[in-house]
Amino acid sequence: MAVVTTRQLLESGVHFGHQTRRWNPKMKRFIFTERNGIYIIDLHQSLTYIDKAYAFVKETVAKGGQILFVGTKKQAQESIVEQATRVGMPYVNQRWLGGMLTNFQTISKRIARLKELEAMDFDKVSGSGLTKKELLMLSREKDKLEKDLGGIRDMPKVPQAVWVVDTKKEHLAIDEARKLKIPVVAILDTNCDPDEVDYAIPGNDDAIRSVSLLTRIIADAAAEGLMARSAGKSGEQPAEAEPMPDWERELLEGDGAKTEAKAEEPKAEAKKADEAPEAEKSN
């Protein structure tokens, strides 16, 4: 079954690029035609690249990897949160903080601080030993950290891949991922540089419907990878048989000895019966 159809891409406006005066010549091979001063993206190529990106994300997640969803522009914020949360993946939809990947050790300390503040009860002034002003300042600190780092609070280490909406706007995320050799999966509009991306999807990164559709496809790939991972875990480690208690082993061994003895009795009787006629003949 196809991941997505050409009709779905058309209905979501994935084929609309930027104005012809705002383009990157490196994207020429992905452009189908020009219409009314706007480039039209070749959706047949988009379908092919979607399949490649889908397979990569699925395999990465199936092997235990995480995909970081990144999209801070207004058109992407809602779908980034919705789809990443649906499949339990980390996300950044407000602001990319410098060093989120390349200086993750420091970011981890800020995440620990966020969790520390979340554990505090800001309504109990008397029991906290702090003034109202101090509690207010701590509450504001928590809100700021939640806004900036809430999406990656459960990300234990740098991700194994990054999904990016609008590579030009998220150039900091792209740069950090490339420094760490983290594969980048991204929508490539006609003004983008395809050399910055490992798994490109030629498409419209400005329209809400286009961004939502493509982000959902990547989330679906992650969901399928999670199912494959779960199935692999259940199949790889079969439950070991419990060791047999000593009393049960002795009982079975005793029964076995009795069975062997009973089996020998008919043989002995048959041997005696055979020996009897021989004795009569000799007499």
From Swiss-Prot:
Gene Ontology molecular functions: structural constituent of ribosome
Keyword Transmembrane: no
Listed GO CC annotations: cytosolic small ribosomal subunit
UniProtKB keywords: Ribonucleoprotein, Ribosomal protein
A GO BP annotation: translation
PANTHER family: 30S RIBOSOMAL PROTEIN S2 PROKARYOTIC AND ORGANELLAR, SMALL RIBOSOMAL SUBUNIT PROTEIN US2M
Name of the protein described by the UniProt record: Small ribosomal subunit protein uS2
Gene source species: Cutibacterium acnes (strain DSM 16379 / KPA171202) (Propionibacterium acnes)
Underlying gene: rpsB
